[in-house]
Amino acid sequence: MASSPNERSEAAQKSVLAALNGERVGPPPVWMMRQAGRYLPEYRQLRADKGSFLDLVYDSDAAAEVTLQPLHRFPQLDAAILFSDILIVPFAIGQNLTFVAGEGPRLTPPLMTAALDDLTPFLARLEPIYETVRKVKADLDPATTLIGFAGAPLTVATYMVAGQGSRDQSETRRLAYGDPALFQAIIGRIEQVTVDYLSGQIEAGAEAVQLFDSWAGSLAPAEFERWVFAPTSRIAAAVGE
């Protein structure tokens, strides 16, 4: 006997959360890291209407709509992933954030030329993201899991130091080895804000959260332990309390 859509959806939710808790489930639940975005014509239209990427992220109605678009088109997906950007954290820490067409994000001033203590935090910049989470949660099928996220400290630090993306992370490595105390302070500041940010997403309705660490694979074992495993473990412990 075929199950009803509600029964299938309820089972999907249970399997997502069970899988994230390390349980063996089948069939495996499915969601995609970039399931909301440019491959969808409805996203491209909304993106064009908003003008800038940051305006889209900070319009909670629009960001909620983008988060839900893949679920409308592909109802078999078992989770929604929040539509936002990993650079919201350095924006909240006090760097200016812009997105340059054809080039990508820019953070100013880059921390190779500016002091961390000169940045003025604007943690209120996180509030619209929480509002997006609340709006998605209100419109989402109750049996579909909502996943929030943030950038992991190393990857976020790479952008903060260089002011933009870097394939070889040369500026970050130069600072980390040349002034390890400052680099550790940057990692620590990111940790603090990320704990608050992920906790805020959970309070707003996210059922699971994750960290994206794009550049972790480029590190030697000792660097990985110091700049990836240790801060990630501290964030996970703090958010899980």
How does the language model describe each region?
Residues 125, 131-241:
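Active-site loop segments of alpha/beta catalytic cores
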Residues 19-35, 77-102, 123-168:
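Glycine-rich, aromatic-flanked loop segments that form ligand/cofactor-binding clefts
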Residues 81-101, 105-122, 206-225:
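Glycine-rich, proline-tolerant flexible connector loops at the mouths of alpha/beta enzymes
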